[in-house]
Amino acid sequence: MYPVDLHMHTIASTHAYSTLHDYIAEAKLKNIKLFAITDHGPDMADAPHYWHFMNMRVWPRLVDGVGILRGIEANIKNLDGDIDCTGPMLDAIDLLIAGFHEPVFPPQDKAANTQAMIATMAQGNVHIISHPGNPKYPVDIKAIAEAAAKYNVALELNNSSFTHSRKGSETNCRAIAEAVRDAGGWLALGSDSHIAYSLGIFEHCERIIAEVNFPQERILNVSPRRLLNFLEQRGRAPIPELAGL
C-alpha cells in the first residue's frame, strides 16, 4: 500500500459522503501518512462555493501524525485550457488537479480533447491531470504523456476508473502508464474516494503498474517527501508542519 492518496472528495461535494474527520480516522487505520482533499471546482453543479476553497486555511496541517493537503479537482473548461481555479484560489491550494467533467466540458473529438488537456498543462498551474484514461474523452495518449513530461505534470491512474466510474478505462489507463514510463514523466495514484472507506485503495492501479513495469521512482505516492518535493519543485512553498513526514 502506498502511504499517500492524492484524490478524494468530502461532503462539500454533495455526491460524496464523508467528512475531513472521517478521512483522518480512516488514514490512521490504514497508515496513510498524507492525503489531499480535492473537492470539485465550483463550476460543477454540486461543488463547494469559492469561499470553501479560500477558507481551507483553517484546516490543521497535521492531525495525529496524518498530513493534510488543501486541494481541488478543477474543471477543464475549454480548448484554451482554462480551469475554474484562478486568482486568489491558486494561492489557497496546495495541490491542484484538473480533469474533464461532462457538465463543464462536454466530450469532443480526440484532437479537441488533446488540445484542451495539453493547453491546461501548458498554463503552468496544474500539478496532476485526473482520470486521463476516461474513454468518453479520447486523447492522443503519446502526445499527452510527452506534454506532461515537458511541463512537469503528473498523469493520474485513478482506481475508481476500474470500479464504479468511467467504465471501459482499463485499456487507456494501461496505455497511459506505458506512455508516461516511456516519456520519463510522473504518475500519480488517486483513489478518487467519495466515501472514506476507499481511501488509499489502489489495487487496480498497482496491477497496471506491475503489468507495465512502471518505475517506482516516478510514482508520486511512494512517500510524503517525494510528493512534497514535487510540489516545491513546481513552485509551492515548503509546508513546515509536514517537514517530518
UniProtKB/Swiss-Prot annotation:
Gene Ontology BP terms: bacterial-type flagellum-dependent swarming motility
EC code: 3.1.3.-
Recorded GO CC terms: cytosol
Cofactor note: Binds 3 Zn(2+) ions per subunit.
Family annotation (InterPro entries): Phosphatase_YcdX_put, PHP_dom, PHP_phosphatase, Pol/His_phosphatase_N, Pol/histidinol_Pase-like
Residue positions binding Zn(2+) 1: H7, H9, E73, D192
Superkingdom of source: Bacteria
Record's keyword terms, sorted: Hydrolase, Metal-binding, Zinc
HAMAP family documented for this protein: YcdX_phosphat (MF_01561)
Subunit composition and interactions: Homotrimer.
Family: Belongs to the PHP family.
PANTHER family associated with the record: PHOSPHATASE YCDX-RELATED (PTHR36928:SF1)
Name of the protein in its database record: Probable phosphatase YE2421
Organism: Yersinia enterocolitica serotype O:8 / biotype 1B (strain NCTC 13174 / 8081)
